[in-house]
């Protein structure tokens, strides 16, 4: 869902996949964290379109991962 009007988006995922943010730009910062431990999680991020990113993990995460996307500029 939207966090702050049309500038931020958050979603929860459990594996590698696409996240549609509908922010209309590839100028976004993506941050990931484990919803159980609250530790920052690292993954490859591909800005596949102006409205989506793909998150690719090296291995499937143990817990759900919160994806925070923020529009820049």
Predicted regions and their residues:
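Extracellular attachment/recognition segments
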Residues: 1-73
């Amino acid at each position: 869902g939207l966090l702050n009007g049309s500038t931020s988006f958050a979603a929860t995922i459990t594996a590698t996949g696409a996240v549609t943010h509908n922010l209309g730009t590839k100028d976004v910062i993506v941050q990931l964290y484990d919803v159980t431990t609250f530790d920052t999680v690292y993954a490859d991020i591909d800005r596949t379109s102006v409205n989506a990113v793909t998150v690719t993990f090296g291995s499937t995460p143990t817990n759900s991962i919160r994806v925070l996307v923020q529009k820049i500029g």
